[in-house]
Amino acid sequence: FRTALFIGDSLSQGFALYAPTRDVATVCAYKSTSPNQVLQNFVGQRPDGSRIEMWDDIKVQSPSNIYVLYGTNALISQSDEAFLKYYSDLLDKLRERFAGVPIYVQSITPTTAEQGVKQPPLENGHIRLINNAIAKLAVSKGLYYLDAQEALADADGNLRGDYVGTYDGIHMNPTGYAAWADYILTHTVYSDYNKQFVTEGPYA
């Protein structure tokens, strides 16, 4: 992870807070943000509480691998279509700026069943629907898709109880982040795996 760059919202901020990525990986993740705000270079809050224009922060990095995750905030604040359009534009911008650098687009992580009831856009069935669209989007651009749900969801598709870190049913504890980081390290993404997302799912 020493040459990895994590880009995203407060969920990705956990990689700056917990082992094994803390003080190792570069984390350009900002609280309560969505792709459209990064595209417009809004000021965002870093994990340490400092504030900076988000795209300006991202574009000066020199990673060997990039891991991107957005969606939790966007699904609450805008339509699915708007989120996917802005996400597509941001991925294009990242491809242009970091030409030749592998970009891994991660699935939106699962929430607790209770959180899905409180905020229907974050219900796990809906999240899986959007993840299908994100997977197709990533593959269509020649990027890699990582299904973090495999490491974080229980048999019912909800965030595992032993990974729940806060009252909101979204963010995880150190155990959850360790499992997530291990999944990233142990899953090589290859083209045959990604082909399935082009032809399957409701957004195919």
Segments from the language model and where they lie:
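Alpha/beta-hydrolase-fold catalytic nucleophile elbow
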Residues: L69, Q106-S107
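Charged helix-capping and loop-helix junction motifs
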Residues: E81-L90, I127-R128
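Loop/turn elements at helix/coil->beta-strand transitions in domains of secreted/extracellular proteins
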Residues: F1-T3, Q61-I66, F98-I103, S140-Y144
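Sec-exported extracytoplasmic/periplasmic mature domains
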Residues: A16, G71, S88, D92-A99, ...
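Conserved beta-strand termini and adjacent loop/short-helix elements that scaffold enzyme active sites
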Residues: V27-Y30, Q106, L146-Q149
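Conserved SGNH/GDSL esterase-like catalytic core that processes O-acyl groups on lipids
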Residues: R2-K85
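Catalytic His-Asp segment of secreted/periplasmic serine-dependent ester chemistry enzymes
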Residues: T111-A204
